[in-house]
Regions:
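Active-site rim elements
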Residues: 7-9, 103-106, 125-129
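A general structural signal for well-ordered alpha-helical segments in protein cores
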Residues: 18-19, 112-117, 143
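Predominantly a Rossmann-like dinucleotide-binding segment in NAD(P)-dependent oxidoreductases
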Residues: 1-36
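C-terminal helix-rich "cap/oligomerization" subdomain common to oxidoreductases
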Residues: 53, 118-149
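Conserved glycosyltransferase catalytic-site signature
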Residues: 15, 19, 42-46, 133, ...
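NAD(P)-dinucleotide binding in Rossmann-like oxidoreductases
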Residues: 37-43, 53-117
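Residue-level signal for the nucleotide or nucleotide-sugar donor/cofactor binding architecture
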Residues: 13, 72, 131-134
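Short beta-strand scaffold segments in enzyme catalytic cores
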Residues: 48-50
Length: 149
């Protein structure tokens, strides 16, 4: 939601998931964070800068002012001399990854079914939760602080 009073706005309600994804991919704690908003009344167009305890950096461009023809969700990972580019959770291209160049899915898969199954298994079978509580609290705290900057 864009309404800051109902739902906390898009940083708390939506961009938080991208912060969470970067925490998962890096596997380390966020050391520093900053946000730069575009000058709009809705505060729904922003760039978020994250740095992690291992020196990794992450940048989230959460924009509401682009063309609908551009992929809505795009993730680029630069590591070990290679690049992975994920578009809309359907198309993955690899550059500089020996033996891998691309993968395409028929439909978008953001992992919700797998996450629900992991959550149910954690409760019913005593497995570890799919997302550690410390990560949930860290991402929530940082998302709230970023939304208030």
């Amino acid at each position: 939601t864009q309404d800051l009073e109902v739902g906390g706005g898009r940083i708390i309600g939506e961009a938080c998931h991208f912060i969470d994804l970067l925490v998962f991919l890096v596997g380390k704690t966020i050391k520093k964070y900053q946000i730069q908003f575009m000058d709009t009344s809705t505060k729904d167009t922003a760039t978020i800068f994250l740095s992690f305890e291992d020196g990794s950096i992450g940048t989230i461009h959460y924009y509401a002012n682009g063309s609908k023809s551009f992929p809505k969700e795009r993730l680029e990972v630069f590591a070990g001399g290679g690049v992975l580019c994920l578009e809309n959770y359907r198309k993955l291209n690899g550059y500089g990854w020996p033996g891998f160049t691309k993968m395409n899915l028929w439909q978008q898969d953001k992992g919700q079914k797998a996450c629900v199954k992991a959550f149910i298994d954690a409760i019913s079978k005593g497995n570890d939760p799919p997302i550690p509580a410390k990560d949930i609290f860290e991402v929530s705290r940082i998302s709230i602080k970023l939304s208030k900057q």
